[in-house]
From Swiss-Prot:
Pfam family, one: Sugar_transport
Superkingdom of origin: Bacteria
Gene symbol of the encoding locus: glcU
UniProt name for this protein: Glucose uptake protein GlcU
Keyword Membrane carried by entry: yes
Bilayer-spanning residue ranges: 4-26, 33-51, 56-75, 82-104, 114-136, 148-170, 180-197, 206-225, 230-252, 264-283
UniProtKB keywords: Cell membrane, Membrane, Sugar transport, Transmembrane, Transmembrane helix, Transport
Membrane topology term: Multi-pass membrane protein
A molecular-function term among this protein's GO annotations: carbohydrate transmembrane transporter activity
Family per record: Belongs to the GRP transporter (TC 2.A.7.5) family.
Amino acid sequence: MDLLIALLPALFWGSVVLINVLVGGGPYNQIRGTTFGALIIGIILLLTGNAKFDDLTIIIVGLISGAFWALGQGYQLKSVSLIGVSKTMPISTGLQLVGTTLFSAIFLGEWSTGVQVTLGLVAMVLLVIGIALTSIKGKNEASESSKNFGKAMPILLISTVGYVVYVVVAQIFGVDGMNALFFQSIGMAIGGLILSAKHETSVKSTLWNLIPGIVWGIGNLFMFYSQPKVGVATSFSFSQLLVIVSTLGGIFLLGEKKDKRQMIGIWAGIVLIVIAPLYSEILKHNYN
């Protein structure tokens, strides 16, 4: 039962961008609504006594990491509007894993031996190959799609910076868990407002996009529940399966068209993107 619950964060987080697309409204309504939805979960945690105001580090780190999450999510949604979910999510997930792994290795000393460096670089190569495979161009893909892909890549790089800072700021200061989520949700809401401030939004679309934000928050709660039960490494590894949920959801639920060649590339790429972090976790715990 605990292992099944540990799989739920991947299901919920992988569904967030799918729900964003299904309810529509464009990236600015989507990011505003999503961050406000996360704030609703944060307020519920506050009201149930799961937010503590006696640690200034948690408050500041929570606000900063939440704001950078909004940056990452907002630009990810901009990429989705250009190239779709099934192309955006594997690339985005792979780039995030590359960024967080390299940061942890270089600045937090997680690769402290020659064996760890060698195996870690192998994991990075697997990630890069996986990203490339999921990006294979279809035989009959229009030139407009190639132009949009070119526009999406710098957007995804900005998104990656947002997500990586969101993760590593918390790692640096040892801030984690349910106590930080309320402050993160405030940072997210502020970030969402800033990103959408100069763009036209509608109340109706923003309200619909509260749903994916609430779903994201619930995914976090399942993560917090499962970590003590199955361990941080297993919980983290399971959470990376979100890329399968979002990518296949984009193809089969949203109807994003792929030819046989692209489907083979997507499946192979997903396998590598999922295997690489598992491989990194193994080397982290077995080659100290």
